Amino acid sequence: MKRNDGKTGRRFDRLRTWVFRAAFLLPALLVYAVVLLIPILDSMRLSLYSGGGLVPTDFVGLANYVKIFTEESFSAHVWGAFRNNIVFFLIVTLIQNALGFFLALAVTRAVRGAAFFRKISFLPTTLSVLVVGFLFRQMLNPIWGLLGNYPWLGNEATALPALAVAVSWQFIGESILLYAIGIDGIPSEHLEAARIDGADWMQETRHIVLPALMPIVGMVTLLIFVGDFTQFDIVYSMTTTMANPRYTTDLFGSLFYRAAFSTPVRGGWGMGMGAAVSTIMVFVVSLGVAVWYYLFKGSRRGEV
Amino acid sequence: MKTFKHAKAVRTIAVLLVAAALAAGLSACAKKTEASKSVTLNLTSWRTEDIERMNRVNALFTKTHPNITINFQPVNDTEYDANMRAGLETDTGADIIWLRSYDTGRTAYDGGWLYDLTKVIPDLDKFPPSAVKAWSTAEGVTYGVPSVGVTHGVYYQKSIFEKYGLKEPSTWDEFIAVCETLKKGGENVFAQGALDDWTLYEVVFSGLGANFYGGESARQALMAGKAKLTDPNFVAAFKAIDSLQKYLPKGYEGLDYVSMQQMFGSGQAAMFMGGSWEIGVFEDLGSDSAKIGWFAPPVAKAGDKLQYCFHVDAGIGLNKKSKNLDAAIEYIKWVAGAEYAQAFMNELPGFFMYTPAKVTLTNSLAQEMFDAAGTADNTVRTVWEKLSAQSPSGNSLMGVALPGMMVDKYTPEQAAAYVQDQLASWYAPFKN
Amino acid sequence: MSTGLKLKDKFYYLLMAFYMAVIAYPLYLMVVTSLKPNAEVFTNPFGPPKTLYLDNYANMISRSNYGTYFGNSLVVAGVSIMMIVALSALAAYVLAKHRFRGSAALYAFFVAGLIIPIKLGTISILKLMIGWGLHDGLGSVILVSVATGIPFGVFILTDFIRMIPEELSSAARIDGCGEAAIFARIITPLLLPAIAAVAVVNFIPIWNDFWFPLVLLKSDAAKTVPLATALLFGQYQTNYGYVFAVLTMASVPVVLMYLLFSKWFIKGMTEGSVKG
């Protein structure tokens, strides 16, 4: 009788099983750990160093963080990016998540054309964020654009929302897709039962669809959160890494790029400081995930 | 046993895939080193508008050096500095590199990436000393060929000026009068925006504001810490620029540099405060020297001497780690010579060569711009030297203060104070 | 859903038409502008082109290295996806079929990568690639893409493999096949739908990745399509028609990929979301 799942058998067999397991697991594990995980930890380590050039060599402990939080010219950028990212996230959530939910309801209706609408709604998501950004930039041009003489990307109040709208336009299709899948998964008996009881469209949504989709709402929210707090491409393409006008479109992604990879003339801070920025981002994202977990998983542990 | 052979097979496939990927990567790296006799030198600058013209100029070099081709790959102006430095640091930089003057270019030398050109440049002693200084260390090591200077002034559409019977203004009051007339007539007075951070500082403030703050002597005093940006003369410059706000086109807060150029070049605005480098761009858009005119930045009061911003724009450096050092040195020698100077100034009017050779300007606008320097006190951009060496740099601070002023976020006094105070956080002469 | 009145349906279609227009118009504008010479872009900004002006595309292909850029993107996407599938399948097989101390933790370890933004380690990744001599080569971007894609691959394939009935493997084992042979001969063919889904889902973000090519690639010969798009946008900013041709070209491959393979794509997303 040959071995089963490694629990019995001679020691040689067990060794062979483990060798086999290692051989199968290690390639993925190595690439994942070495290229994704370790660099994040290493960057956190590098944030404790300072010095010019690609690899900072002088150990300065927490001096970079002290500088970032006490000196106006640095802290203004970090807090600015933080504030902008939150506003950005809220606008995107409103459009992409909330509006997306309702559009998902719409494209899952059993009417002619719904499948076509569903397929097309995902089209913008296939584009590069860069392309979308450049496209919207041209459309919002005050001289030759679509929306008149108003300086959408020049006015501090409208620039960031413009970026949020562009990103939402692009990714609403992804939310629709995920919600539609969830809606498809609702057993039709539930909906029929509700219909028989005389529920209308809105009650159906509130009492059956929404609760059933809660896990997906959670997933979409999480995806949007992590994506927004590392978003860079849209800033690069719509308002350049200088986050025009006057850093009001600065997100953590653009701040990180500018701080780490630009020269001082263009707002660069050096690699050590750049690593400090990315470390701050790690904490912000972790905090956000923790809050998400509490909101979407923790309080629901008791429910189904 | 059979099983092991198969396990190996699967593992081998995985390993092969990884190897294939690495090979693809390495071969992309290796592609650069060419083993053949013909050599390609990579040249980079921030002049993405000039690809066609530069290729024509460099073709002349290939004519006399048939085995050397120049591959010109410019990078967008705003990305250039970071790109250049990253390339040098990671050994993927171009062979020939255009360098900005003073501190920005200096960091490339300090990093040890540039070849010492002191003994390579022919007739270095005949180059204008102020230009040489911009690409040399205090100890006398020159790391960049002083190549190109640019000036700043105001372009205008001749047809629009004729329509209102306007003459080129020479004083600021005349200038404002011209603006008023045009505005009353319903024209777009300026094709000028406040979106891009650098245009208002590099051209408008350094160019037109110099007449108010006192040009070179004021700049020297500022660097020495003997003057402040909040002094009356500098604030006067901020105020003067601010007074132009009402003549900017509708939506100017969102108008970026390229759109500005398009707008003026296609004849939709009367004036454009710009640099000498724009001549070629306007030509391409249909506004050649027959259609547009130029005047120097108007002086503050009648009788004042023109404080002319003749900025040291570009030097040409050589990457120490170039794989084709000999060919690159040949090219460096060539760009420091007369043939390059003449060809360059023909193809790219508005760039003024520092080469100590007799060259003739064929473009009338360029000639006007060059002549203005003869009777003026020349200076360079306000906070370019020393004041932009560290973060927050004078340049980036101006890039926030001036657009902010033009959208009334700051008053002129606040804008001046903003730059001054932030610079004081690291610039030693300002700390007191 | 509730049976609507005629009015309700009319309202619905109106809404959908509006929504479709909102999606389609920017794309229409992009394509239409790319077919105009620069001068016409300003005189006729929103209407259809007067003639089919193909020069922008011709110039792009002849004057720039577009063929190289396209080829690079293809290599990166192709090799990355092959490696993601291969590495993920191998790991997923062990995680699905073997239960040992730590296997659950290991699985969680992989899946956590789904929400860990790899971007945050960029500085160290750059350092790493320089140290390995891979920077400015496609290998660096490939490795990053693979690392990013492994969590999703493991996530999807582990479940899929778990669903493969144990009897098939047991039967093979009785016949004398070892684990590896079982994997290669029996499991892999059954995995093809899931593999297709993983491949298609990963194609879009890998093709469109801008950040890592921006940081890791420098020389012209190594650039991928998004990087070249940004470069050409910067180089030819004053020629709007050309710029839009560049944008259109950058979009065609992925749009095509999506339209042809949307079935697999949706399958992949379905697997992912049902488990989330």
Predicted regions and their residues:
Chain C
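A structural signal for multi-pass alpha-helical bundles of membrane permease subunits
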Residues: 2-276
